Amino acid sequence: MVILHNKNATVKIDAGELVGYQVDGHEFIHQKGSPGWSSADTEMFPIIGPVNEAGFRVKTPKGEAVQDQHGHLRQMEYQLTEQTETAAAFVKKYHSGTEVNNSKFPEKSTEEALTWPYDFRFEKTFLLTDSSLEINFKITGEEGMPFMLGYHPAFKLHTESPVILANGKKILLDEVLAVGSRALQISDCTSVTLKDEKEITIETEGFGNFMCWTEVRNMVCIEPISFYPYAVKQTELHQGFEKLKNTAEFKVVLKPGV
């Protein structure tokens, strides 16, 4: 467990996964083991969304890739590369064509192994400041590699009626619950605020959109995404790809209200 701290905040990171962000004694992150989701955060890469209706195949310029929901990056392990009192860096490296074991097999998937026809290096860094937690993503790889990126943090809810503020509109928890597994789309948006017992704002650079998901009342996932996957058929998911130009950088800033 990597622990970052300053005078009023503590961050807990377990093998690259953000499992705690406590400010003045208030925990903002969903606790693993609580109802709702078995994780606390994950990255969705190089695809976002499910592909079971597409035979677990995604079109790329180098042919079809075998993928599963939210991509194969989440099935790989992070290596810790740097750590200080207030910062930490983690890396995943992938070599084209390498088989990655799929934890969804055999219960939820027919695919035992996932592959991708491109090399890449994926870096996730955390920086705890006096007013926020910055999470940066840096993707390095082959020129022209297609990809999507989503960040999937889960926030702990402390009250019965939290409100999500986005693009000047209020979104109630019941609205997120009603959408179910598809996730509620918030398009053309770079900042979302969750108003609960305390409030926290999720500011982003590079993503451009969000989606919100939960199936319980004690947590909600507010996810910055480069593409909303449910806008297209699963067989057309490649329409949402960006193309890598050597390096791509994305930023998420979690800013607790004062």
Language model segments and positions:
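Surface-exposed beta-strand/loop patches in extracellular or lumenal glycoproteins
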Residues: 149-155
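Asparagine-centered strand-capping/turn motif at beta-strand->loop junctions
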Residues: 137-143
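Short, hydrophobic/aromatic alpha-helical segments in well-folded domains
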Residues: 121-122, 136, 150
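Surface-exposed acidic/polar loop and edge beta-strand patches at domain peripheries
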Residues: 1-132, 145, 156, 160-258
